[in-house]
């Protein structure tokens, strides 16, 4: 059975690929789940258009990610004032990815989604300088140092 994939399928192909599979696999698995459509000339044209638009979007996303990376690198580091427990340097709570994003925006950086921020540990729980990695695109990531300082 000849099919055109509408979703990425492991060990078979990616969106827009024309593949030859056994009838049962196509009829009972791929077609009911919407992962493929039966190959025809019209369907092939539609799949080619979808593939071209995705490639164009991927290039735009990569360019946008590079712009954000440049803006974040221009910041160098970001200060994040927090309340501390006495003089020990431990925090009353913890610094999360959302707090880091808010500090970047407050410092004049771009507005980011907190899901792209990767902390070395789940939360920052002490005063000091901590590295933070942001995954802007599958191919692009940027590192920023966050200075957690005691609020006065």
From Swiss-Prot:
Keyword terms of this UniProt record: Ribonucleoprotein, Ribosomal protein, RNA-binding, rRNA-binding
Top-level taxon of origin: Bacteria
GO cellular component: ribonucleoprotein complex; ribosome
Gene Ontology BP terms: translation
GO molecular function: rRNA binding; structural constituent of ribosome
Transmembrane annotation, as ranges: none
Family in the record: Belongs to the bacterial ribosomal protein bL9 family.
PANTHER family to which the protein is assigned, alphabetical: 50S RIBOSOMAL PROTEIN L9 (PTHR21368)
Name of the protein in its database record: Large ribosomal subunit protein bL9
Organism of provenance: Mycobacterium ulcerans (strain Agy99)
């Amino acid at each position: 059975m000849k099919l055109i994939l509408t979703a990425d399928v492991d060990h078979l192909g990616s969106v827009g690929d024309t593949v030859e599979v056994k009838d049962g696999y196509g009829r009972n698995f791929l077609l009911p789940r919407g992962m493929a459509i039966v190959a025809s000339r019209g369907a092939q044209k539609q799949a080619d258009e979808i593939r071209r638009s995705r490639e164009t979007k991927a290039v735009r996303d990569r360019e946008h990610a590079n712009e954000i990376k440049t803006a974040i690198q221009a910041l160098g580091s970001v200060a994040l004032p927090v309340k501390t427990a006495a003089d020990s340097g431990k925090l009353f709570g913890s610094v999360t990815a959302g707090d880091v994003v808010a500090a970047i925006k407050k410092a004049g950086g771009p507005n980011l989604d907190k899901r792209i921020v990767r902390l070395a540990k789940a939360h920052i729980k002490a005063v000091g300088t901590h590295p933070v990695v942001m995954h802007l695109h599958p191919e692009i990531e940027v590192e920023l140092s966050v200075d957690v300082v005691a609020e006065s």
